[in-house]
Amino acid sequence: MSSNDGTTPPVLFVVGTAGAGKSSLVTSFQRWARFLDIDVLAINLDPGAERVHYDPEFDVRDLISLSEVMDEYDLGPNGAQILAADLVASQAVEVFEEIEGLAGDIMIVDTPGQVELFAFREASSHLVHVLGQGRACLIFLFDPLLSSTPSGFVSQMLLSSIVHFRLGLPTANFLSKSDLLEPETLERILEWGENLDVLEAALFEESANQAGFDGGGQRA
């Protein structure tokens, strides 16, 4: 894989929980880049994707079908996704060689919804480093609905930190689909990300409210 100046294009891995909007971001990024006349290479590494709305230069579904993995190994969707990730990682060099000859300014990679594949599986770490070739970073997408509670927001902070720690790549957190949130909710979430004291207070309040709810239920 080489860009127009002969160097390896930087690689941007899009990571996040299922439904956070990874494929939507890749689609929008590709359209935005084309508008600016930037040559972006979109890569799909999700073998379980039913459809994508971007134009992938490489699609892992051409190598591995999640439904075939489920049938062959008698696995459910989650187990098949994990095994499929291991199978893709075992072919990481072959995948890299297939996209190596593509010229572009940047490569953006759509990843499976199971964020634990990046947080806890060595296979995904191997795949990321082979494809990244030392010129990679991560975008971790925060789900807007999960982010609307202090505990949900912190849970995603922890997941992002684990992925960053495991892969050792520069990581940026972004709140996805923020247009779905009410303005006051969006403002509150952004404040949590900027002021840990405010976030801590919100966590204590949430915990106290939950304790009161549980206690009330027990008395009933």
Where are these regions (language model features)?
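Conserved catalytic-core segment of NTP-binding enzymes
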Residues: 116-219
